[in-house]
């Protein structure tokens, strides 16, 4: 791991201090995003943006809970970008272009109908890999995610490796396997 992402993880851990569930979640999403991005052969700039967005993707949860009494994904998309912008500005090692793309990804990571860019696709897949497990989703939900959400070869392989051995039939719902 590079120093920039290690420092971002430290800052986000401080931001989520006392909330191990959220810290565990973003760490797992980061690791899956980093893995998928590497296996998909992303260029260094896109990989950097992806990993930063994965670390920060749920930064809007606490403020959403305070403002709306809910951590619903749409509220996270509303509140997250500004919180992320503040944290990245304090760190002083993000360009304006990086900040804008990371904020865009955070502001759309629960919107699945118009995914634009490989970084966006991989962030969504990484978050799904973690959420499908953490939320103990049904076989139907996992199969549906495989069919409708996952597009990268690496993401599909990880999903199948994670869930097919448990009796879930993700592969039978993909036409392009």
Language-model regions, residue ranges each:
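Divalent metal-dependent phosphate-bond-processing catalytic cores, especially two-metal-ion Mg2+/Mn2+ enzymes
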Residues: 2, 17-27, 31-43, 56, ...
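Active-site flanking loop/helix segments enriched in acidic
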Residues: 4-28, 60-70
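An active-site-proximal "capping" alpha-helix that borders the catalytic cofactor pocket
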Residues: 29-32, 36, 74-91
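Acidic/histidine metal-binding catalytic segments
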Residues: 41-52, 92-106, 119
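His-Asp-centered metal-binding catalytic motifs of divalent-metal-dependent phosphohydrolases/nucleases
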Residues: 47-69, 80, 103-110, 127
